A protein has these predicted regions:
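Phosphate-backbone recognition surface of nucleic-acid-processing proteins
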Residues: 127-130, 136, 140-220, 254-256, ...
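Glycine-rich, often acidic, oxyanion-interacting loops/wings at catalytic, nucleic-acid
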Residues: 40-127, 253-254
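Short, amphipathic alpha-helical segments that act as regulatory/interfacial helices
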Residues: 15-19, 40-43, 47-50, 54, ...
Length: 264
């Protein structure tokens, strides 16, 4: 369901589609594609479970006056956690949470290795991984969920497809913009935002753009904007068949020179 409503444009679009009999076709992923998505989702959910468990262990330590943050899960930190003198039920909770953590870690590592193996089989995934901040998980998810770049005429359509553009409810001469539409894959949106933040830390140009947006708007808005920028950049890298270093020769969205999003 389209979440951008503007009466005149919608009317023109419907009229053109009826006149040309050119309604868009629906792309359906194949069985292998759908099964590999299960691999991505399975790992994602297990990582979320692990994060919740680690947060609970942090809370247990803080209740005893210890604030170790990430150090809690190093070998010395864990040893200190296990030495804490706790009440009976708190002690049992600590033990069972640590047991769950010990079971999750090797499973997540196994799934991560499987994702990396699948990524190495696909040249287009390896090409996307040349972009700063983009690892095997993000690149493979992007390729599986987008399917084929030829489905889209320009990079701007990618932002719409992944649900990272504002909702719009406009009529007459009034334009009303809301939150992002959140259409498409929530997993891909999450990965794009995470990868964009990694790119901000590694790439000076991305850091400059993010800082500018964060100062003008808000950090959360800037993060989504950089995630959308990354989605468009990856689209053009994939469609045109070049790596990150070559993409720097083009515009800010790595499309065609001088055309903004790459579309004429």
């Amino acid at each position: 369901m389209k979440k951008q409503k503007f009466d005149r444009e919608d009317a023109r679009l419907i009229l053109r589609l009826m006149r040309e009999n050119n309604f868009p076709q629906i792309w359906v992923p194949g069985p292998q594609n759908r099964d590999l998505r299960q691999l991505l989702w399975h790992r994602h959910r297990l990582v979320q479970m692990r994060t919740r468990i680690m947060n609970q262990l942090q809370a247990l330590a803080m209740n005893e006056g210890y604030r170790w943050k990430k150090k809690l899960f190093s070998e010395p930190g864990r040893a200190q956690l296990e030495k804490l003198t706790l009440a009976p039920w708190a002690s049992r909770r600590r033990q069972e949470l640590l047991e769950l953590l010990d079971r999750l870690n090797p499973t997540i590592a196994e799934l991560t290795a499987a994702i990396e193996r699948e990524a190495r089989k696909r040249p287009e995934v390896l090409r996307l991984m040349t972009h700063p901040g983009v690892g095997a998980l993000t690149a493979l998810a992007y390729v599986l969920i987008i399917g084929t770049p030829t489905r889209f005429h320009c990079g701007k359509q990618i932002g719409t497809y992944v649900g990272m553009i504002p909702c719009e409810d406009s009529s007459a001469h009034k334009q009303r913009l809301g939150h992002i539409s959140k259409q498409g894959s929530s997993l891909l949106r999450f990965l794009l935002v995470e990868a964009a933040q990694a790119a901000v830390r590694k790439d000076p140009d991305w850091r400059r753009r993010y800082t500018h947006l964060a100062m003008r708007r808000h950090k959360s808005i800037a993060k989504v904007a950089m995630g959308r920028r990354l989605a468009i950049r990856l689209y053009w890298m994939w469609r045109n068949g070049y790596g990150y270093s070559r993409s720097l020769e083009f515009g800010s969205y790595a499309g065609q020179p001088g055309t903004g999003h790459g579309g004429q």
